[in-house]
Amino acid sequence: MNKVLVFDMDGTIADFYGVDGWLDCLMAEDTRPYTTARPFYDMWAMMEVLNELKNDGWRVVVTTWLAKNATKEFDKAVRQAKLEWLEKFGFPYDELHMVKYGTTKANCTRKLGGYQILIDDNTKVRNGWTLGTTFDANKNVYEFLKNLRFGG
């Protein structure tokens, strides 16, 4: 059976909302929140546990929304900035989906089948998840993954 961890990006692995003036930046189509956000966790530790889970057969998917009401040019810039963020911090993933704001995230990973866990900070998104279970990213994601790894 496929086992899939589906991560949101903004507010889950990247502290996007911790960037001063993030909303004003987005309204001005400025990618700074995407380029300056810090990781929520020690990425070395996160990479280690995710790579161990991948060795145990889990797939890691990042499914993230683009900015709300953005132009095509800004969407393109956001895609590039998010990709560079993931590369800069070495977040290990098997698939990456950057989709229009509000897209049902389950539609991005449904084809993978199996047991899927969505890790997201948005309650509405978690409540709409239909492919398995969810974990609230406002809690300690790293501890959750360690427990998943060691069956705790």
Protein language model annotation of sequence segments:
Residues 4-6, 10-88, 93-95:
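Alpha-helical substrate-recognition element adjacent to the catalytic core
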Residues 10, 66, 102, 122-123:
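Short, flexible active-site-adjacent loop segments at beta-strand->alpha-helix junctions, enriched
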Residues 14-17, 68-73, 104-108, 125-128, ...:
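Short catalytic/ligand-binding loop motif for oxyanion handling, primarily in non-cytosolic enzymes
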Residues 48-52, 107-111, 128-131:
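A short acidic, amphipathic alpha-helical/loop segment
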Residues 114-152:
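Acidic, Mg2+-coordinating phosphoryl-transfer loop and its flanking beta/alpha structural elements
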